[in-house]
Regions:
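Helix-terminus/linker motif at the lipid-water interface of multi-pass membrane proteins
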Residues: 35, 39-57, 127-134, 190-197, ...
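Short runs within selected transmembrane alpha-helices of multi-pass transporters and secretion channels
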Residues: 78, 146-165, 173-181, 202-217, ...
């Protein structure tokens, strides 16, 4: 039987074995990692909401769309850099593998420095542009500036963990994320409660925890991963490899940001509905993410699976992986909907404490509406990440346009027609528009590749 896992290193060959089993085995650490990541984000929300106040919670919530757009660009780009790494690993091309790894690291350094400086300078004007309520603006600016200054730490973790996942190792990024999650919670309590650092303390805790997890992933890569030996010959700047990385990575970043522009438009609409709507949607969205981010983890597993099998020329395994991925997402969506139905009031109370009834009821309404349509997001993650894993990241940008349209439509409905209900349906509208396009493109691409084979 062919060896599929390198002993000691944790890397895995996803081009062999039953697709459903391989995807589940690879996705499980990603899902657990996402849950723990959301756990510390959830705890962070509770600490901010209860120890500082609902205005502070709303201030952090108003930064979500900008965070989604700017930091999301960086994260998606790092994920894109992992696709050529997965392809060269699947094709057993060690020279290409080393050159992609080195050139990807160089691009990450440049990108992180440019974004950290540029976004910090424009943070306040951007928050004013989206009509952040005056009573929330000061805290929002303080919070997001620290997050933006910490972009290099974010890039370090995301690129190093993406590289490990591209080599088939999803376990160790999970272990290190687990460490950083507990560290983040401890630092939150320390900075906010006894030290009284407010929202700045929450932001600093996030940056420090990401830096620690990035250092741990990098250490593991250089000391434990086998068959990686950088030399003067393969550790060089390469135009061909840099262009390939940029061709896949930056469009994935743009796709995320284009989608996030819709979130910015939606946030503008929420802000116009007032601070009560802002606090309600912020609490509901935090709880929603706790249930749906595992779907994105399954999508990330699909991207690595597709990348390795595409590199090995196994289109048949790509098709089977899509089918099995959809089965996983449909089952999880049903379970998540039931769970939200059972715990939504308890979860909202946990986040908001003794908040006024209008905020509490708004958060519950948000969860009630959006949970029914979780399956749209689950399928979108399968088809979008398949498109990216196949290397068609430029075409995937258009799916971000679909999300932009959906969120913009929801924001318009909120302000002009449906009120807060329009906010509740904005994300499902975005998922539906993007899903239609991604299904069409994946079907078309696989037919094209089957004919070429």
């Amino acid at each position: 039987m062919e060896e599929t896992r390198k002993k000691g290193s944790g890397t895995t060959d996803l081009t062999v074995g039953r697709p459903l089993t391989r995807i589940l085995q690879f996705a499980l650490p990603l899902v657990l990692g996402t849950l723990f990541q959301q756990l510390y984000s959830f705890v962070d929300t509770i600490i901010v909401g209860r120890c500082i106040g609902t205005d502070a919670l709303g201030a952090v919530g108003t930064t979500y769309s900008l965070n989604f757009m700017i930091v999301g660009f960086v994260l998606a780009t790092c994920n894109g850099f992992g696709i050529p790494v997965a392809e060269s690993f699947g094709a057993k091309d060690r020279d290409d593998l080393h050159k992609y790894l080195f050139n990807g690291a160089v691009l990450c350094v440049v990108m992180s420095l440019v974004f950290a400086v540029g976004t910090t300078l424009v943070a306040a004007p951007l928050l004013q542009l989206i009509h952040t309520p005056a009573e929330l603006l000061e805290n929002a600016v303080h919070y997001i500036r620290i997050i933006f200054l910490g972009i290099p730490a974010t890039v370090l973790y995301n690129y190093s963990s993406t590289v490990l996942r591209s080599l088939g190792d999803s376990k160790h990024p999970f272990y290190f994320l687990l460490v950083s999650s507990f560290l983040n919670i401890a630092l939150d309590v320390l900075f906010i409660v006894p030290l009284g650092m407010g929202v700045e303390g929450a932001a600093i805790a996030t940056v420090i925890s990401q830096l620690v997890s990035g250092i741990l992933c990098t250490w593991w890569f250089f000391t434990k991963v086998e068959d990686i030996h950088f030399t003067r010959e393969n550790c060089v700047l390469s135009g061909r490899h840099s262009k390939r990385l940029a061709y896949i990575g930056f469009p994935m970043g743009f796709e995320y940001s284009v989608s996030a522009i819709g979130a910015v438009i939606m946030q503008d609409a929420i802000n116009q509905l007032g601070s009560v709507a802002v606090a309600a949607q912020t609490a509901g969205e935090k709880i929603r993410q706790m249930f749906t981010l595992p779907m994105e983890s399954v999508g990330m597993a699909i991207a690595t699976y597709v990348g390795q099998n595409h590199g090995a020329g196994r289109t048949d395994r790509v098709r089977q992986g899509i089918r099995d991925g959809c089965i996983i997402q449909a089952g999880y969506s049903a379970i998540a909907w039931v769970a939200v139905f059972l715990v939504k009031r308890w979860a909202v109370g946990l986040v908001l404490g003794d908040a006024e009834p209008a905020i509490f009821n708004g958060a519950v309404e948000y969860l009630t509406v959006i949970s029914v349509l979780f399956v749209l997001l689950g399928f979108l993650m399968i088809f979008r990440y398949t498109l990216q894993g196949l290397g068609y990241s430029v075409q995937a940008v258009i799916s971000g346009v679909g999300e932009l349209i959906g969120r913009a439509l929801g924001g318009w409905l909120a302000v002009h027609q449906l009120g807060y209900l329009g906010i509740c349906i904005s994300n499902p509208l975005a998922w539906g528009f993007a899903l239609c396009y991604c299904v069409f493109m994946v079907t078309r691409v696989l037919k094209k590749e089957s004919r070429a084979a």
